[in-house]
From Swiss-Prot:
This is Putative FBD-associated F-box protein At1g61330. Residues 10-57 form the F-box domain. SUPFAM superfamilies: F-box domain, RNI-like. InterPro entries: At1g61320/At1g61330-like (IPR053772), F-box-like_dom_sf (IPR036047), F-box_dom (IPR001810), LRR_At1g61320_AtMIF1 (IPR055357), LRR_dom_sf (IPR032675). Pfam families: F-box, LRR_At1g61320_AtMIF1. It comes from the Eukaryota. Residues 384-416 form the FBD domain.
Length: 447
């Protein structure tokens, strides 16, 4: 053993048992269970564990009954005064009573973070868990689990900062109770939840000073979102473009709109309405549906110009999904309205431009490739990334556009999927060589 190792061992031996046990109690319980045979001195420290993370309990091919037995033993023999964290991921069928008992134990021992994932059962756990007495809980994440919160709780959930609900029935009364009781709430996630009633989600957080982040994802029966949150900084929406977003969000800095196309309703107007509150954001992630709605459009037989100017936008990422008529022209017209843009990412992993694009060739190509008037000069742009690059001729149009119109360009990365070689096009060597004479920093990677 080296001299340095000897010194470390001597230092450890000088520590009191109480101090070492306190330090070890903060380790995940599965780690202390696995290593308890290595030291007789600390073989029982798992009984004091504060971090009861059982998320990977099936990773060693245990059966459901074996996993439940291990968790039950931990709770029966737990001697610590507090439990900081409890993470559980299993099929709740047949063990609901045990789960309720475990959660009750956590609540009695001042739990701070509680994560319950019952998605493996494919059935929502209908037995409601009562959090009304919790005065310490700061993080609550429930998947496939019924959630109830009475209004005007005297104590419970006052310190809650993060709430994430998945596959839970949501009512506006519940949302009101959340914001009435959880006065320190910073982040709310609603994923694959069922919106009851009229399909209108109303979030009134006008008096909240700490509410910073909202995620609304995959709620198919949602018709409208009315959001009044002056302190909100990050808003993420994933769903049909038909859903109307009415937003009062003065502090918004980051927005994501992962739109899916609705077959029943033309979505341009609802997309435009949603963007009214987002033109001042610094970072924007979206799909080509946004471009279709806010770049040049024909309205009543007349060609309308873009509706928005994104004066503060610095980061822009767009996912292309078929079908779409969008081309480099639509991208360029959008970017022209972003004078401070520094980073641009386009993801075309699941998209391929058409072999022939006559409208582009006839109406837009000459306009975009004409650099004499500098209509598309991107002075601040430094980073460009194309994810899913396959060497298509129009992808090279996009690459050429950026090397010609971004004088401050530092990095241009083309990410080619390793498993998409069959979709890759024959390289246009001459054109690639021309592009590299303009900007030598083009980097092709495989991911």
């Amino acid at each position: 053993m080296s001299e340095a190792s000897n010194k470390q061992m001597k230092l450890i031996k000088r520590l009191s048992d109480e101090l070492v046990e306190c330090i070890l109690s903060f380790l995940p319980v599965q780690s202390t269970l696995q290593h308890r045979v290595l030291s007789k001195r600390y073989r029982d420290t798992w009984k004091l564990s504060r971090d009861l993370d059982f998320s990977g309990i099936f990773s060693v091919r245990r059966s459901q009954s074996e996993a439940v037995r291990i968790i039950e033993d931990v709770f029966i023999q737990h001697q610590g005064p507090e439990i900081d964290r409890f993470v559980l991921s299993l099929d709740h069928t047949g063990v609901e009573d045990k789960i309720l008992s475990w959660v009750d134990t956590c609540l009695r021992k001042n739990i701070k973070e509680l994560v319950l994932d019952f998605s493996s059962s494919k059935k929502v756990m209908e037995i409601p868990l009562n959090f009304s007495s919790s005065e310490t809980l700061t993080v609550l994440k429930l998947q496939w689990c019924r959630f109830e919160i009475p209004n005007n709780l005297p104590k419970g959930l006052r310190l809650l900062k993060t709430l994430s609900l998945m596959r839970t029935e949501v009512t506006n009364e519940m949302i009101d109770s959340i914001f009435n009781n959880c006065i320190h709430l910073e982040s709310l996630e609603l994923v694959k939840c069922q919106m009851s009633g009229n399909g209108i989600l109303t979030i009134y957080a006008h008096d909240h000073k700490k509410f910073k982040s909202l995620v609304v994802s995959c709620m198919p029966n949602l018709l409208s979102i009315f959001l009044d949150a002056p302190t909100l900084e990050c808003y993420k929406y994933d769903g049909y473009a038909k859903t109307i977003n009415v937003l009062k969000v003065n502090a918004l800095e980051e927005a994501e709109f992962h739109y899916s196309r609705s077959k029943r309703r033309h979505s341009s107007d609802t997309v435009v309405d949603s963007m009214l509150a987002c033109s001042a954001v610094h970072a924007l992630t979206t799909t080509n549906i946004l471009l279709e709605a806010i770049t040049y459009r024909y309205l009543k037989g007349k060609l309308e110009k873009p509706l928005f100017k994104f004066e503060n936008l610095r980061e822009f990422k767009i996912f292309f999904k078929a079908p779409t008529f969008c081309t480099l022209f639509d991208i360029a017209e959008f970017l022209k309205e972003c004078p401070k843009l520094e980073q641009f990412i386009i993801d075309i992993q699941n998209f391929t431009f058409e072999p022939q694009m006559y409208f582009w060739e006839i109406h837009h190509k000459a306009q975009i490739q004409n650099t004499s008037n500098n209509n598309y000069l991107l002075k601040c742009l430094t980073d460009v990334k194309i994810i899913g690059y396959k060497g298509h001729w129009h992808e090279l149009d996009i690459v050429e556009f950026f090397v010609k119109n971004a004088p401050s360009l530092k990095r241009l990365e083309l990410q080619m999927p390793k498993n998409a070689k069959n979709d890759a096009h024959t390289p246009d060597v001459a054109r690639i060589k021309l592009i590299k004479t303009i900007f030598s920093g083009v980097k092709v990677t495989e991911v």
